[in-house]
Amino acid sequence: MIVFIYIVLVFLILRFSVTVFNFLSNPKLGHYGKKFDDKVSIIISPSSVDATELIQSISCQDYKNVEVLMVGSNEELSTTAANAKGRYLLFVDSCSVIKMGLLNSLIYRAKVFNLKLVVLIPNRSLNSFQDYLLEPIPDFVLLNLLPLRLVRLLNLPWSAAAWERHVFYDAESYKRRNADSEEGEKDEKKAETLLANGMILSNKRTSVNEASKQLLSTFDRNPLTIAVYLLFLIAGPLVLILNSQLAFISLPFGLIFLTRIMISFLTKQNPLINVILHPLQMVALTGLLISGTLKKLFTSGIHSKS
């Protein structure tokens, strides 16, 4: 048992270290003063939310050399992108709003660091209790596990499927990616993942099913990885509480408290609410991952039998 407790503490300290690294390195899209005139094609993914507010925010941009393409309800995203004429492609969800300076900042970042792909993590509009319960969870998991700055610095390939609603591509790179070419695989390493820093606001109301799918994508839908993560995330602290003295328990609680504060400031969320709701969010995280994994395994079993 003592070995398991030490492993749990090491896992907790490693996650805390990643959060501290993200907090100090501040992986946000900066507001740059440079101006560009390269054509940008903004491709709007369909959803249940009307895109009027998004289109209005695009028209208010200081960047005018843009074309706006709407993906049809029965149309593939790649089909719409193939008709785009821009040098850069910005994929956004229809329930989003973009702020002034976004396009110039993205192009500056892509040119200076020779990036072919920029994954953006939007700020979230939280209104209902369900929003406060579910929406912060993906941000917590990502910023607690992945040092975002190292994605570019070490050319780390990682699955960005969970964040594919807000992506900025070099157009030629996107074509090579869809062609499954060798150059397309190399372009995947010329990528960066950044917090949108208030320049993209997502108003999407995430359902339980959608939240589960996003979390599964974060772990690349690997049941073993999910099981190990939940073992140390949930079972670990419970074992500590049941088998340790109060002075020993204060360490993990202090690290969790500081972790939630730092991630809340990074994502511009309310730190007090996230700290208070942390136990409920962890219960929700466990339920979402377990239900999503079981559903995936059950569905895979049905398909394999048929």
PLM ranges: what are they?
Residues 89:
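Short aromatic/hydrophobic "clamp" motif used to bind/position activated sugar donors
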Residues 20-66, 77, 148-157, 289-305:
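N-terminal signal-anchor transmembrane helix
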Residues 1-34, 136, 264, 285:
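N-terminal membrane-anchoring/stem segments of glycan-assembly enzymes
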Residues 72-84, 100, 104-105:
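Glycine-rich, basic loop-to-helix element that forms the pyrophosphate-binding segment
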Residues 81-83, 106-169, 173-175, 274-281, ...:
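Long helical/loop segments within the catalytic core of UDP-sugar-dependent glycosyltransferases
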